[in-house]
Amino acid sequence: MDRDDVPYLDATLPTAQRVTDLLARMTLAEKVGQMMQLDSREDLDDHVLRKHVGSILHTSPERVLRAHDLTTRTRLQVPLLIAEDCIHGHSFHDGATIFPTQLGMAATWDPQLVEQVARVTAVEASATGVHWTFSPVLCIARDLRWGRVDETFGEDPVLIGELAAAMVRGYQGDGLTDDTAILATAKHFAGYSETQGGRDASEADLSRRKLRSWFLPPFERVAKEGCATFMLGYQTTDGVPITVNSWLLDEVLRGEWGYQGTLITDWDNVGRMVWEQKLQPDYAHAAAAAVKAGNDMIMTTPQFFEGALQAVEEGLLDEKDLDQAVTRILTLKFDLGLFENPRRPDTARQQSMINHDDHVALNLQVARRSLVLLRNDGVLPLAKGKIAVVGPLADDPQTQLGDWAGSSGQADWLPNGQPRDMITTILDGLRELSPDVTYARGADILTLEPDPEGETFPDGQPRPRIIQPCEPDAQLIAEAVAAADAADYVVAVVGDRIELVGEGRSTATLDLIGGQIALLDALAETGKPMIVVLLASKPLVLPESARDAAALVWVANPGMQGGRAIAELLHGLIEPSGRLPISFAAHAGQQPTYYNQIRGQHGSRYADLTQEPAFAFGEGLSYTTVEYGDLHVETAVLRPDETVRASITLTNTGTRPVRETVQVYV
């Protein structure tokens, strides 16, 4: 192809002119293909050469290169958008930097730090040929039984909006022409987390007032920040799938907010309208509905290709209906400069930038700042002495990383997870700092059994296996008690595992499962000072033996450097500064327990239990005391869209340094 004679290949022309020229050259099938994003683990030749796909996801390094090579064989050689779930680091690239989960980041309450995390993630991901990440998550986490709480920034829309905006800035860098920039995705628009009984992807029973008051403001914040793409949730609201919700997509997002970015469905949303929600009779009608609703990129619905072609043939769609979506997709590709440089994997950049020393240092800093001290009777920082480290999660590298990382199950090209020598577990960290450490597992947590309904869902996706909690093991408990009896301090590491976290893995209970409660009870009876480290993806309900422990630290999947950070905290080498971005329930039956609930007519309690959380949003201790004084509100009169400004004097009244997060509730 002679580039001089083809306007869309002329980089000196305005993007709009290039898009118009290319769109005029495309066949109907090529337009439909541009609207599709398919799984690269399937038939790449079919995806690229027959379906003309605009994007692929779940790409191993080998598949990325092959996909680019296939693109050079297509008629128009339109470059692909390469997408991946880089949720808290470049999650599925061997040796990449894996940070704390989004909920862990939220415990820092620090937008600048979160922006740095996203910037590092973009630098590492872009070096491997990834153009697009499906992050950040802006869902409000209220029901702790929901399996995806760990992916959120917690329960407060203001905190969520500020941290998400910071993440968008980090991902998209200095603009899309920056080779280290990747497209950010605000998800899951909107109300996805407002589940039925905490069950993932269930009907969201939300009024428009509730959406506008709580669930939409974070999305509006990142829309105005320039977030390039929005992902639509799986769920229905008022019986209407978000995928075709004209009020949300047209009136609010495109209309009121003036959003000009690209909309992508979540996994097989269009297909779900046919086979799951049963709101469309076939794929032709589903494709027509999705296009007319304003969807631009259809994720992993292979049947959309034939369905859209059939819809045009039957008059359900006009070919021009596709043009607006294809225009937005092509505009992204031109803005990224992919026609001049498709941004293939860059081996030299990978070697110099992935897991760079600066990235490791940032990872440790974020892990340190994410730790939340919830109880301390004075035992921390630890004095010299022998430490018994017990618990099934004390030496568990995958639980350190959390979901959407390593061997969490989404990437078949990384079956053994991230390199073990890159991960410092809690046991590793304590052994590095303490000369006298013993270890006993103390309990098992769970085993897995096949789902009796079959190995896959109707769309072919694998069903998670069923959890079977392990019974307390008398021998393991006896070994742990013996270790505790011989030590000066007990560090008990308990929590949840990856099998209890994520899509389709919501839990009916919030209790510690398996033999963990029996282990804690037995350790408490030894009388030795017990420090409970709750290594948990989300807040759990703790037994009395944990609530009454000498100290309690919550750690939300702290990433590769988490074990080192925890050991430093326990030994007093760093100061605890994390604050809860989400409340802890005292009982699963209290759900939800978010801090800013509206009081009911008959108060805020049950007949048998109060609604008070075990620990509330914003809580977190330090190793010193801080006195607040001289509060002065500088804004005497507040008009719409103005900002309240105030000042306060903080005094460190203790003997150790402190980082204090000043919280203002209006």
What kind of feature is each model-predicted range?
Residues 1-666:
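Glycoside hydrolase catalytic-domain context in secreted enzymes
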